Regions:
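Conserved, well-structured functional cores that handle cations and Mg-NTP chemistry
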Residues: 1-157, 162-177
């Protein structure tokens, strides 16, 4: 759902990385792969090579600005990325911060209820029939539960106002102790 090229551009700042982006972009654009399997592999890598007891889990939402109406979950809503109401998709993301760096280790696309109820539109956007409406805090809880189940240790959890203000999210954290 998210453009690999845009993802690479956001983390690759030096001009010399353009060639690396093109090398990776071509085969990835044609390849069929399961994003959840890639996430699981990444989380396993974090557990084996990067995890620290003092790690920090960071949960936030981010906006992906869009021009059209066909992308999954797109609509006019507030985007922190733009700082105003824009046509965009919203993703809930979980990053892991450790002493040597950080990694984005999980994500879910927020699908507004109208998108979940309109199966024709959902089918056109290739949204699986198994998807159902979930609030952004519910998605954050899902990300946190998957991360804990993967065995990624963390001493701290930081969350944006939406997730951090959710009593079910805070109770999930309290019950982990």
């Amino acid at each position: 759902v998210l453009s690999l090229h845009k993802a690479f551009l956001s983390v690759c700042e030096a001009p010399r990385t353009h060639l690396a982006i093109q090398i990776v972009k071509k085969p990835c654009g044609r390849a069929k792969w399961d994003a959840d399997e890639v996430r699981d592999d990444l989380q396993q890598y974090v557990v084996e090579f990067l995890a620290e007891q003092d790690g920090v889990l960071i949960i936030d939402e981010t906006g992906f600005l869009k021009k059209g109406t066909k992308s999954a979950g797109v609509g006019r809503r507030y985007s922190g990325t733009a700082g105003r109401i824009e046509n965009c998709q919203i993703g809930v993301v979980l990053a892991y911060r450790f002493s040597k760096g950080h990694a984005l280790i999980d994500r879910e696309l927020y699908l507004p209820q109208a998108w979940c109820e309109d199966r024709t539109r959902g089918c056109e956007a290739r949204i699986p029939d198994t998807n159902s409406f979930a609030t952004k805090p519910a998605l954050a809880r899902e990300l946190l539960q998957r991360t804990v189940a993967a065995g990624i240790p963390a001493r701290w959890v930081a969350a944006d106002e939406v997730s951090g203000g959710d009593s079910k999210f805070r109770n999930l954290l309290k019950n982990r102790d």
